[in-house]
Structures are given as structure tokens and as C-alpha cells.
Amino acid sequence: MAATAYLLYRLALRVAPRGPAVFGGLAYVCWVAMFDGDGGQTPIFYNVFMVAAAGLAMTVATRDARGNVARGGTAMLLVGCAIQIKYNVIFEGAYFGLAMLWARRSNGAQAIVSTGLLWVVLALLPTALAFSAFAATGHGAAFDYANFVSIFERVADSHARQFKRLITIIGIISPLLFVGYPAIRSRTKTGEALFVLGWLCAAALFFLLFGTYFPHYALPLLLPVAVVAAIGLDRIARPRAVAAAVLGVGAIASVTVSGVNIRSKGDYVTAKRLTAEFNPKDQACPFIFDGNPVLYFLSNSCLPSRFIFPSHLNAVIEAQAIGVDQRLEIRRIMRNRPQLVMTLEPHFVDENPRARATLDAELLAHYRAPTRLPYGKRTALFYRPK
């Protein structure tokens, strides 16, 4: 996150003075927690690749009249690394590529096509290497399903819930959009500023089209929004006062959100207490039906299934998106008599009642009454075989 913020600052320096550029980098740090990024969502790891790619792409698209092929290729390879972490950045990567190709329009159609193909290959190279590694071990079909098919088989949330999440996200990001508005409405934009605004449009378009609107899906938006805010801050009255007020609100909100998360989900002490319930020496792997999968790692336990994220087996939206019936997989796991089964109360709000009923039947037949431990605002239940 620190590296991403620094690269944002360096990128913003190309479109704004030092003070507003510092504001852009700090704004990213302050807003990450508000979008559930303080726990390490995937954008925290791929955003650094994207902001580095953006800097290179901006140079090719705005300063190099003939479009430097090697620099553009490096940008697209960085995009490819980000894509292999998560595919959400495809629209942004496509925008970078098209913007750079536009800079080469005077080179002729043949040069544009050949360069475009090279850049596409570089962007797809990390994914191709990952697929090859899986295919070489006989898991090519599983890679294909998990990466390209399952997302389209998830059950969508209700429109009302999606709309509520969208409004919440807009509210959270609105202070930065307010600061950046002068940059958006300005009639005198440099090539670099236009590039950043185009980047923002590409990121926003994917975010809106993808749907679901969980907070962490807005984390990639923070990159162009922070740079646009830096540009806007340079064009408003009393920029220091505005920057101090916005960053102050952001910092307070960030600390508050992190505190709420700790109270609702627990902290290090909670994790240590829960981990003590696991026995890594037992050959019967534990099964976390509901809870944090990091407990497998912290307890050095074996894994009962390839579906180690609890939502894969307990969430309604994943019921048709994992390639197997949730209930059949739960029964398969329970036939191995896990040394420990962990669930939480109250139940997960989006829990699949049919999956829960399958688990409860197994617990009633083969497991003792549970041990109960506090888990933030919920209670962890640990079942052991009779």
C-alpha cells in the first residue's frame, strides 16, 4: 500500500504541483480502510502494478509522439501481472493499450496492428503461464472454470441491496470527487490530465457493469480518483484548508472503520484464542464452515477441501458457481470426520439454508455439543466428534 501511495504521488506530480500530489497519495492511504482494504483485499496487491503501468502508459500516450514500443510493452506486462491477481483491471488495461496505440496513429496501420498484437500478448502472458502450470499438472479445466466460468454462474443479489451498496460507495468517495470536480469540468486540460480522466472513466465503467458493489470492488477506482483529486485541488480556492479538512475526515473515518472492524470481527488476541482450538497434529483436517480461513494457516492445519473460503460452501450466491453441489461437498468433507468443525452465530446473512441444514444434520448425528468462544460481535462454535 505504501508503494502504491508513493507511485500515485509520483504520477500526480506530472499533472499537479507537489502539495496536491502529496494530497493524492495520502488520500489513497486514508480511503483504503473505508473500502475494506485494511485487511488486504486483492486490489491492495494489484493496484501497485496498475499505477506503475499508468505512469508508463501516460508517457507513451502523451509525451512520445511515435509511441515507445518497449515502454508500452512494459506497461502492458505490468497490467498482465495485475490481471493474474484479479481480472477486474481488464477494462483499465484495454484503455491503457488503446491510448498508447492512438499515440502511434501516425505510424501507419501495419505498425499499429503489430504493436497492438505484441502488447496484447504481453498482457496475456502471465495468465498463459499460470494456465500452463495448472494444465501441466492436469488441472487445466479447473483453472478455466475458476477463472473464466464461475463468475458468470454466481447468483446475483437483489437490486435493492446492490443499490444500497452503490449509494454507500458513492457517499464514501464523494469528498474526493468533490475536490476533483474542477479538474473534470475544466475546459483546458493537458494531455496528461485527459489521460487520467480517461482512466477514471474506464475504471468506473467496469465497476458499474460488474455490479455487486461490494466495497472492495471500488478500491481500483481510488487510483484515478486520487490523481483527479490532486488535479482539482490545484484549481480551487484555499487548497491547503480543503486538503486538511478532507484528509482529516478521511483519517478519522479510516481509524473509525478499522476500530469497528476489530470490534465486529476480533483482533490478534481473538485469533490466538481461536487458533488454540485447532490440533495441527491430528490427521483429520478441521473444517471451517463459517469463520476466517486464515485460521487454517495460523494453526498449521491441513485443508479438508479445495474450497477453503467458507463462502464457497455456505453462501447462496456461490451455490451454482463452484462446479459442484455445496451439499455434496459438505457431505464428502464430513464423511472424513473432521477433528474440528467451526461455525459462527448468528448465521451469515447470505447463508444458503440448504447448505446449513446439511451441515446441521451431520453435526447432530456425529458430533458433541459445541465449545463456544467470543468472535468479535459473533460467537464461534467448535464441534468435535462423539
Enumerate the language-model features and the residues they cover.
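Transmembrane-helix signature of polytopic, membrane-embedded enzymes
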Residues: 5-30, 47, 64-67
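Specific aromatic-rich, kink-prone transmembrane helix
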Residues: 5-7, 46-65, 71-74, 78-79, ...
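Membrane-interface transmembrane helices that cradle and orient dolichyl/undecaprenyl
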Residues: 16-19, 53-74, 106, 176-191, ...
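Membrane-interface alpha helices of multi-pass inner-membrane proteins
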Residues: 33, 68-87, 93-98, 125, ...
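Short acidic/glycine- and proline-prone juxtamembrane loop motifs at membrane-interface regions
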Residues: 38-46, 215
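Hydrophobic/aromatic-rich transmembrane helices and adjacent perimembrane loops
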Residues: 91, 208-240
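Short periplasmic/luminal acceptor-recognition loop of GT-C membrane glycosyltransferases, typified by
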Residues: 94, 264-319, 323-353, 376
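Hydrophobic, aromatic-rich transmembrane alpha-helices
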Residues: 168-204
